[in-house]
Amino acid sequence: MPAAAGDGLLGEPAAPGGGGGAEDAARPAAACEGSFLPAWVSGVPRERLRDFQHHKRVGNYLIGSRKLGEGSFAKVREGLHVLTGEKVAIKVIDKKRAKKDTYVTKNLRREGQIQQMIRHPNITQLLDILETENSYYLVMELCPGGNLMHKIYEKKRLEESEARRYIRQLISAVEHLHRAGVVHRDLKIENLLLDEDNNIKLIDFGLSNCAGILGYSDPFSTQCGSPAYAAPELLARKKYGPKIDVWSIGVNMYAMLTGTLPFTVEPFSLRALYQKMVDKEMNPLPTQLSTGAISFLRSLLEPDPVKRPNIQQALANRWLNENYTGKVPCNVTYPNRISLEDLSPSVVLHMTEKLGYKNSDVINTVLSNRACHILAIYFLLNKKLERYLSGKSDIQDSLCYKTRLYQIEKYRAPKESYEASLDTWTRDLEFHAVQDKKPKEQEKRGDFLHRPFSKKLDKNLPSHKQPSGSLMTQIQNTKALLKDRKASKSSFPDKDSFGCRNIFRKTSDSNCVASSSMEFIPVPPPRTPRIVKKPEPHQPGPGSTGIPHKEDPLMLDMVRSFESVDRDDHIEVLSPSHHYRILNSPVSLARRNSSERTLSPGLPSGSMSPLHTPLHPTLVSFAHEDKNSPPKEEGLCSPPPVPSNGPMQPLGSPNCVKSRGRFPMMGIGQMLRKRHQSLQPSADRPLEASLPPLQPLAPVNLAFDMADGVKTQC
């Protein structure tokens, strides 16, 4: 649960940048050890909450007694966020008064919706939205610089360079609004605030209406109100567009340079005011203004909207960009959504680890710019941290450096884990298409991106008998061929195209099966076919002499997948209903009954099970002779007892990394997902009693032909 109000309160710390001696030097180190933020940033002094003058509390905000502004239906008051100790501006809209104006009632929530759509450095940031039975609250960032109108009153008028800076920022904000399809319609000096860095902050858009601008709903409207900033087409009730904001910018520019309004009439009359605008009877301009400023001002106050420049043309004006050291404003665009790389890792980690918010909630809220208490906490803590670091630049690099590394691991891990969790055989094919084959030098490193397996799999690992001598000879020849290829190939980087660790390497783990066709994938050995030989009644010793023992045909026993690997392995009834055609592989394959085979959900009934042959590489093709032929039981072969902790498997074992062949007819993922069902022998009587008598086995005759299949005779 998020921390309650008042948690983390502490005494008043030293101001950022102030003297503190050893205490200030030790505070950053202590903050890094136990917290992701300095104590001055994460803590809230009790005196700050106690001394703040307020008359009520709404949510996590104290509504202060100081009034920042007032309108017809709303009042802007200073507030305090109790969780961060930061001051905010709270716009309180009286619902009862707003009901008197149907337009305001209908568009009451439009301002909050628009501000959540927009992000710009010269537009106030909306932090939170609250609503009660009688009031509607908009919590925004506080602009300590006050109103621009107050600054003009103090200075009488602004210098041309200072006014140019403000106008450039105002046009940039309006251009961003127009790009998003928003027309402010109420640009005036009172709606231009200044932040702590003396930058323009545009406020109060979304609630203005035509009636308020025209002055009909408010009989006390004067020349200092909205009608003095309205464009001629708006006063004439003609069809208007975004260029009405360009006219209002011209009025604001005139007010900054002269301290007065460009068009005034005595006594006030809308008809007389409109006539002055159309006739271009502008009040006199100061003589010290440059010709560029006068020319630009007259173009903005053009009464004909067709001849008036649009906001993009105004932003590209030569006078506006004169002596401007930054990028040309018309070429600068601001995204309405913050990117993941721009998130403050220290603030996000503090909110998730200390305040108890979910990591996904914090990131999604900030990235979507959704006004709520999570966005308010993040914005205020981040601003507080920036203010702290600006006063202590010497510890900016050392402050919570571990949080930057932690942020990389924690917030970029989902992207890497998503890429790493792609289907393995699909990534194998993509990698194989680019780099053809993996160098064998990487196989010896033993690095393998494997998955954790259950402990039951480690206990049930099967052991296999030594294969025949002829098979071992062919495997050794294949191994020598691989060594020759390894010497002729160059090494490849250890990183794949996804930026992850190279998974195409040989592994020494018995739980991982690797293929010589570069399709390396972690799978438990019980999921692969196992070579099972007929048990012999007598095993001669190493030194025994006599007639050499006949080699029994090898059969592949398909075992169950993950759901049944903890049970004992059993033998299935074999049937000659399927004919396997093997090319270039001297191995005898057992036939199985298709009616007793359990397939994975992704394969149709009657499809063939994949077989793993102990050669490299082996091309296997499957042909189904007769689906309707009845199954015929020929015989069963029982496996020898399998110890749980057997020695390391020989090269001829299917568990060996070089014992699987490439199957071009299906992907490695499909082959490994096949599930095979085995028969459970009765436990009350031995297996030999339930089996039919076995016929003596004849020597195995293997015929190799590229056109014909391998024929096995039992």
From Swiss-Prot:
It is an enzyme of class 2 (transferase). Its EC number is 2.7.11.1. The active site is at D186. Residues 1-26, 437-471, 518-552, 590-660 are annotated as: Disordered. ATP binds at L68, G69, E70, G71, S72, F73, A74, K75, V76, K91. It catalyses: L-seryl-[protein] + ATP = O-phospho-L-seryl-[protein] + ADP + H(+); L-threonyl-[protein] + ATP = O-phospho-L-threonyl-[protein] + ADP + H(+). Residues 1-15, 599-611 have a biased composition (Low complexity). Disulfide bonds: none annotated. PANTHER family: HORMONALLY UP-REGULATED NEU TUMOR-ASSOCIATED KINASE (PTHR24346:SF80), MAP/MICROTUBULE AFFINITY-REGULATING KINASE (PTHR24346). This is Hormonally up-regulated neu tumor-associated kinase. It comes from Pan troglodytes. The lineage of its organism: Eukaryota, Metazoa, Chordata, Craniata, Vertebrata. The gene is HUNK.
